[in-house]
Structure formats: structure tokens, C-alpha cells
Amino acid sequence: MSAKVLVVDDSGTMRKIIIRSLNALGVTDIVEAGDGSDGLELFKQHPFDAVLTDWNMPRMTGLELLKAIRAAGSTVPVILITTEAEKGRVLEAVQAGVSDYLVKPFETEGLRKKLQKFIGVAVA
């Protein structure tokens, strides 16, 4: 069984890095978006097992995306992959309902552990 994951980041390079890491873990059902607004539209159209999102993006930030997902009543795991590691910012995300976060640059092993924890599927 492969998880379906939504990857949201305004950097095409970072999306490729995240997707490559997911592929290395055996996750191949991946949908990508270049900002939170597009990510939210995709989220509304498709069921996802997890959402991986950057924080700082144009049009709609990852935090705004997270809040919109939670406001819709969804409990899908949302993992922020971000450079935002300052305590106040992390607390803001936790209060908004983030499942977890990874600080860029991240290791594939860290991503694997979080995916196993939240979506309960074995990843390589």
C-alpha cells in the first residue's frame, strides 16, 4: 500500500528534493503544488494520507494552509518542512494543529520516521 502525499512548496527545487526523498522511501503517489492556495484546491479535490508543506510561500502560507485544512474538519497529518525553527513560530504551528515539522535541510530518515508515525504505512 502506498500513501498519497501532497507536497506544497514554492521552490521547484525543494519540491524535487522532497519528492526524491519520498520516492526513496517507496512513496510514489505524490501530487505537488507551488503555493498554499493551489495546495488547498488540490486538497479539496483529492483524498491525501499526508500533506508536506513549506511555511513561507506567496498567496497562502503553509500555516494558512494548515489552518484551512483544520477548519474543514480534516485530521490528515500535516508536516511543515521549513527553516522556521524559532520557538514562537513552532508554538504557533502547534496551536494551529500541525502534526509535526522538519527543519530544512532535512534527512530522508527523519521524513521516514514522521511518515511512519502519522500514516502508519511501512516506508522503506
Where are these regions (language model features)?
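Receiver (REC) domain active-site loop signature in two-component systems and cognate sites
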Residues: 57
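Acidic catalytic/metal-coordinating carboxylates
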Residues: 35-38, 61-67
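C-terminal output helix
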Residues: 106-115
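Active-site T/S-Asp motif of two-component receiver
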Residues: 53-54
